[in-house]
Regions:
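Bacterial N-terminal signal peptides
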Residues: 11-22
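Beta-propeller domain segments
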Residues: 30-34, 93-95, 105, 173-263
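Acidic, Gly/Ser/Thr-rich repeat motifs that build Ca2+-stabilized beta-propeller blades
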Residues: 28-177, 236-256
Length: 263
């Protein structure tokens, strides 16, 4: 019986793998060349800083523009929806995310986040409303992140709905500093503290009230709407309807972006 070295056997195995792989790669290349080209159609190129969108039905899309307009696209027809909101359109602010209610067929509610301005300060605010005659009506403010700060970035703002039908909303840390000596304190403290909404995921009932099973409800000094904390600028959130999990995307300063599962 002949004895073969480990190196010899390894080379033979490697050669067999190559023989098996090359045809597969060629087939994959052929399939992609013939079937993997994306098909797309440009619906409109008349948008100004689009930020969020919601499919109202199979043909209508409602789009938020940070510059302050809502646009309803039906096929190629664009209608402007009047909002009259006091929007801080500067930096990363403006009209932000928009989602339709999980019960939209019954209540026709739409949920919108925007950078609300007051006395030169701003914050992330959440409203819900209906649309009638190309304007928003029945407007209710459901939430505003506290405190207001003198910053025009890191609003977060993304919306989704969890398995139980709660609304989840992201709020950024707002990059809130006024002097160089405070930078370290702000980055280490604010998103980690439970007495403010900065750098948090917020969990609400659809009417803006606080769910009774929120994790920090009843904790001394904690704001009851907080669901998770310690975020920088979470500008993506997704509910996987297959397994019920919720994920957020948290932007890093120069790389270091994170995808976090909320548990």
């Amino acid at each position: 019986m002949r004895n073969y070295s480990i190196e010899y056997v390894s080379n033979i195995i490697f050669f067999i793998i190559i023989l098996l792989t090359v045809p597969s790669l060629s087939l994959a290349k052929y399939l992609c060349e013939s079937d993997c080209e994306p098909n797309y159609e440009i619906i409109t190129n008349d948008l100004n800083y689009p930020w969020g969108f919601a499919f109202l039905d199979e043909t209508r899309i409602l789009i938020s523009e940070r510059s302050g307009l809502l646009k309803l696209i039906d096929g190629k027809l664009i209608q402007n929806i009047e909002t009259r909101l006091q929007v801080n359109f500067s930096g990363q602010g403006g009209l932000l995310d928009i989602k339709k209610s999980p019960n939209y067929d019954q209540d026709k509610y739409l949920y919108l986040t925007y950078s609300k301005i007051k006395k030169g300060l701003s914050t992330t605010a959440l409203i819900r409303f209906n649309i009638e005659s190309n304007r928003i009506v029945n407007v209710e403010e459901l939430f505003e992140a506290l405190p207001y700060v003198r910053s025009n970035i890191h609003y977060g703002s993304r919306i989704t709905f969890d398995e139980a039908g709660h609304l989840l909303l992201t709020v950024g840390d707002r990059f809130n500093y006024t002097t160089a000596s405070r930078i370290a304190d702000v980055f280490k403290a604010d998103p980690q503290r439970l007495d403010n909404h900065l750098g948090k995921t917020i969990r609400l009932n659809l009417d803006g009230t606080t769910p009774k099973d929120n994790p920090f409800l009843g904790l001394a000094g904690a704001l009851p709407e907080i669901f998770t904390y310690g975020h920088r600028n979470p500008q993506g959130i997704y509910h996987n309807s297959v397994d019920g999990q919720v994920y957020i995307v948290d932007h890093g300063p120069k790389g270091g972006d994170e995808i976090n599962q909320l548990v």
